[in-house]
């Protein structure tokens, strides 16, 4: 297997794994293959961010592939050890983990917390911060405990662990500021009318500096993002083709938050469980270099839909999908 040279990357030939990418864009490439093997081709300390959502450790085996919960942690750590070597010293590894229940009983699995502890104790990562993704549009689950027996509320929050290689990862929260509330906007416009400086019980001196316009408010580590893509290009073309969409897609706003906060333009972003390649699409929009890996050819072929123009013909969509599925390597820029 050949190893890439980051110093000689071009926009459409970013890697050389001894195999061609399924498709390329201006900033990135999507590969079909085992990400554990493909990861080894990166030079050590070359990646700025690995942003991914691995197959969840669900008790019912899904078509996108997952292991029994007791095997899951060891399996995931085999990837994490390689990621740790390939990250830059100021690099980050952000992982979205879905919740799970123990088999047959309404008691939660703690596999995601076992991953967290072992990532720190055994692999050497640091927990830069724990995030929680609240998806208000998530359907009630699991059905047995929520819908049928009605003894548990719906599971609508995923843990998102932000790991870093060192204690000081690259980060800039000014890139992800949230819009001010209406009340805060009024305070900024006329602080004397809406605010009286005082010292709070905590000892913080709340003065006029708190009315300064900093471009937005500091976001919390609870990210409220709906996962509803019903009108998106990807799902529309999957429906047009009569093929199944990837069953576990996170919304673009999730990787967007971390890509903006943890990287700069031209930094390299990698998704080791690419799926429908949401991470690659966001990295492309944000002018980051990107590489995504996915084992299933049908998911890779469909993921190309994310990069197509809205007015592209059905014939062209079908042609692109089938050519990727048949093993061709496509430059989407030249086709679009």
Curated annotation (Swiss-Prot):
GO biological process: DNA restriction-modification system; methylation
Protein name, as recorded: Type II methyltransferase M.PvuII
Pfam families listed in its UniProt record: N6_N4_Mtase (PF01555)
Catalytic activity as recorded in UniProt: a 2'-deoxycytidine in DNA + S-adenosyl-L-methionine = an N(4)-methyl-2'-deoxycytidine in DNA + S-adenosyl-L-homocysteine + H(+)
InterPro entries, A to Z: DNA_methylase_N4/N6, MeTrfase_CN4_CS, RM_Methyltransferase, SAM-dependent_MTases_sf
The organism of origin for this protein: Proteus hauseri
Keyword Methyltransferase appears in the UniProt entry: yes
Domain of life: Bacteria
EC numbers: 2.1.1.113
UniProt keyword Transferase, yes or no: yes
Location of region: Disordered: 196-215
Subunit structure: Monomer.
Sequence repeats: 11-113, 181-293
Annotated Basic and acidic residues bias: 202-211
GO function term, MF aspect, one: N-methyltransferase activity
Gene3D superfamilies: Vaccinia Virus protein VP39
Enzyme class: transferase
Organism lineage string: Bacteria, Pseudomonadati, Pseudomonadota, Gammaproteobacteria, Enterobacterales
């Amino acid at each position: 297997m050949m190893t890439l040279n980051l110093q000689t990357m071009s926009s459409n030939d970013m890697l050389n794994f001894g195999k061609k990418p399924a498709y390329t864009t201006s900033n990135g490439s999507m590969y079909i293959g085992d990400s554990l093997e493909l990861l080894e081709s990166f030079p050590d300390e070359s990646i700025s961010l690995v942003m991914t959502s691995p197959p969840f450790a669900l008790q019912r085996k899904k078509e996108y592939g997952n292991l029994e919960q007791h095997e899951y942690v060891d399996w995931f750590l085999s990837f994490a050890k390689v990621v740790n070597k390939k990250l830059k010293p100021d690099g980050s590894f952000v992982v979205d983990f879905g919740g799970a229940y123990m088999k047959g009983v309404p008691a939660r699995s703690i596999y995601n917390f076992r991953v967290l502890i072992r990532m720190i104790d055994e692999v050497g990562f640091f927990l830069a911060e724990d995030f929680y993704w609240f998806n208000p549009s998530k359907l009630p689950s699991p059905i047995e405990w929520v819908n049928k027996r009605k003894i548990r509320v719906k599971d609508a929050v995923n843990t998102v662990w932000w790991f870093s290689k060192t204690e000081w990862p690259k980060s800039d929260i000014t890139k992800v500021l949230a819009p001010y509330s209406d009340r805060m906007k009024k305070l900024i416009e006329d602080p004397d009318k809406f605010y009286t400086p005082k010292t709070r019980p905590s000892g913080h001196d709340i003065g006029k500096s708190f009315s300064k316009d900093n471009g937005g408010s500091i976001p919390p580590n609870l990210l409220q993002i709906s996962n509803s893509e019903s009108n998106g290009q990807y799902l529309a073309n999957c429906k047009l083709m009569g093929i199944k969409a990837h069953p576990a897609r996170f919304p673009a706003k999730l990787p967007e938050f971390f890509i903006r906060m943890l990287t700069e333009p031209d930094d390299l972003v990698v998704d080791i469980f690419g799926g429908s390649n949401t991470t690659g699409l966001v990295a492309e929009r944000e002018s980051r270099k990107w590489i995504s890996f996915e084992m299933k050819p049908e998911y890779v072929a469909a993921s190309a839909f994310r990069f197509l123009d809205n007015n592209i013909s059905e014939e062209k969509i079908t042609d692109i999908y089938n050519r990727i599925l048949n093993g061709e390597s496509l430059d989407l820029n030249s086709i679009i």
